[in-house]
Amino acid sequence: MKRSRMKTVFFDIDTQIDFVYPSGALYVPGAEHILPVVGQLNRHAPFLISTMDAHSQDDPEFQIYPHHCVVGTTGQRKPAITLLNDPRQFILEKQQLDCFSSPRLEPLLAQLDADRYVVYGVVTEICVRCAAFGLLKTGKPVEIVTDAVKALDEQKAREMFAEFTAAGGQLTTSNRYSPT
């Protein structure tokens, strides 16, 4: 398979209406404030994988969390600021917390053959965590953009950041990826 020229792959994790707006079914308080940063990162991304929860009406996850991101609802959609309308953005729907549960992700990563991953979105200590730690298993550098994530539990997020850096991950800010 031919190697893609893209070396860095950005991951926009679950920035969906149900999570990022106060009217959302599973709102993460303050998440709307990261949207401008997420939008900027997405526009700068050489290649972007945007994950989306895509639940059925009777999804088993609703035994743990309230109904959210049901396929076809407004809440499942991504805010316009996060969309590129560009072939650099790949939308990856998933039914579980971990984006690696999607059978489409690992073949895509193999095809892209990235040298580095940049991760941001919601929820820091849940789905962002799953993505970041899953990507660390590739053996490639992984960064979490700390001003482009939002947590439900700030203490758990701090613990996750400590665990992540101890495992070899890096923390950064969006300034690193600001256009010059």
Predicted regions and their residues:
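Histidine-anchored nucleotide/phosphate-binding helix
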Residues: V37-L41, I126-G139
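Active-site acidic carboxylates
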Residues: M1-I91, R158-Y177
